[in-house]
Structure formats: C-alpha cells, structure tokens
C-alpha cells in the first residue's frame, strides 16, 4: 500500500514551504521606504514626542539630495510641518487633518534611514517660524516706505533741475 509520504508531492510541498519561509523574512526586513515615506514616519514620530496640543502635518518637503544606495545609511532631510486642527489625543493620521488657520509652522532638519526595519530618524525642529515670517513682513513694509520716500525725493530733484534748464521761446 502506497502512502502520501512515498509520493513526490510531499517533497515538493516541503521544499516550497521551506523556500517560502526563508523568503518571507527577507521581504519584511528588506523593505526600503521612499524618501517621502521615511519623512512621513519621522513626522509621525515628532507628533508622538510633541507636547503641543495639536498634530503637525507635512507642509513642504525640500528636494531630495543625491544619496547613496544604502538604505541603512542616514539620509539628510529638510522639511516644514504645520499645525493642524486635530488634537494630538485622537488616533488619526495627520494627512486626514486640515491645517489650522494661522497655525504654527516648524522648520525641521535631520536624518532618516530608508530601511523600514531600522525605521530610525534624528530630527530637530525650530520653535516658531512665524516670528521669521513676521520679521520678513516688517522688513518688506519698511523697504516699501523707504522706496516710496526715495522715489518722491528723486522726483523733486528731477523737477528742480528741470526748472533750472534754460528755456527757449519760439
């Protein structure tokens, strides 16, 4: 009497299961994140560590620098995040939240790794980019006022010399 053990199909199934078992961990370990995916994970980490009331969402990601092919090597990143309307206490993805009007904007720099198994990042963010924006607005307004004043002075000088020029009557 012939049993299933004696048949060739058991050997094939055993080999198939062995190969499947060996390749599955490699697929999980070897997953390489895209540059943007790694940054989004870093933003999630920042939200978890943050003591602010609301979640932050990626606002702008600076262009990807040229990188080597090793996903374990830390890659430099630079991006801005903006405060959303979602409280940090809810379990929601920041991408599902709207930006808060006049919300806090933070500029962040650091490094991320693209290897999902390592999933490491070292990011630091400035406290308030709005102060820089306000200073820029003040400087722009001051420049406009100074420019307007110089334009008036220039017109007066032009008028003065225009009056001094000899006039010829016809």
From Swiss-Prot:
Subcellular location field: Secreted; Vesicle
Gene3D superfamilies: 3.10.450.10
GO molecular function: lipopolysaccharide binding
Disulphides: 86-97, 108-125
InterPro entries attached to this UniProt entry: Cathelicidin-like, Cathelicidin_CS, Cathlecidin_C, Cystatin_sf
One GO CC term on file: extracellular space
Propeptide segment residues: 31-131
Signal peptide: 1-30
Region: Active core, residue numbers: 150-162
Keyword annotations: Antibiotic, Antimicrobial, Cleavage on pair of basic residues, Disulfide bond, Immunity, Innate immunity, Secreted, Signal
Major location category of this protein: secreted
One Pfam family here: CAP18_C
Region (Cathelin-like domain (CLD)): 31-131
Post-translational modification: Proteolytically cleaved by proteinase PRTN3 into antibacterial peptide LL-37. Proteolytically cleaved by cathepsin CTSG and neutrophil elastase ELANE.
GO biological process, one term: antimicrobial humoral immune response mediated by antimicrobial peptide
Family, per entry: Belongs to the cathelicidin family.
Function of the protein: Antimicrobial protein that is an integral component of the innate immune system. Binds to bacterial lipopolysaccharides (LPS). Acts via neutrophil N-formyl peptide receptors to enhance the release of CXCL2. Postsecretory processing generates multiple cathelicidin antimicrobial peptides with various lengths which act as a topical antimicrobial defense in sweat on skin. The unprocessed precursor form, cathelicidin antimicrobial peptide, inhibits the growth of Gram-negative E.coli and E.aerogenes with efficiencies comparable to that of the mature peptide LL-37 (in vitro).
Domain notes: The cathelin-like domain (CLD), which is the propeptide part, does not seem to exhibit auto-inhibitory function, as it does not inhibit the antibacterial activity of antibacterial peptide LL-37.
Protein name, as recorded: Cathelicidin antimicrobial peptide
Protein species of origin: Saguinus oedipus (Cotton-top tamarin)
Gene name as annotated: CAMP
